[in-house]
């Protein structure tokens, strides 16, 4: 089949020739951790997790992801230890098993997992819709507008 519109958080797709895009939201990033492995009781900050492994999904853009995680942690005064894993599921399982923490976004399904908690971070990433340039369907523009309003009001 042919997709009319794709929802993505992948920034590289926005630069593909023949693709149009619209940002619909900025998703807040969070630091996901296992409550059983919290560094201490009470109020936590990202700095409290400086000794943890930061699990990230490895791939061809591993340098980009590593730099991204480092830039997210820099305002908190530390450089994270990065531990690549092969998939998002492996990253979540790693957090669940106490192997480290993960930077994800506020829409992650893992946030509702019993035994997990998260800290809001001073960082966001864009959620975008993309479609082929040849699709000049006004319904796509209307969909973008409706989706932006829906997300904003959620």
Q: Where are the predicted features?
A:
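Short beta-strand-centered segments that line the small-molecule binding cleft or hinge
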Residues: 1-29, 33, 91, 96-99, ...
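Short secondary-structure boundary segments
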Residues: 9-12, 35, 105-108, 133
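Flexible hinge/capping segments at coil-to-helix
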Residues: 16-54, 138-141
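Secondary-structure junction motif
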Residues: 52-76, 141
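Conserved glycosyltransferase catalytic-site signature
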Residues: 66-67, 87-89
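Short beta-strand-to-loop elements that line the ligand-binding cleft
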Residues: 78-87
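A generic "structured core" feature
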Residues: 80, 98-106
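A late-sequence structural motif
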Residues: 117-154
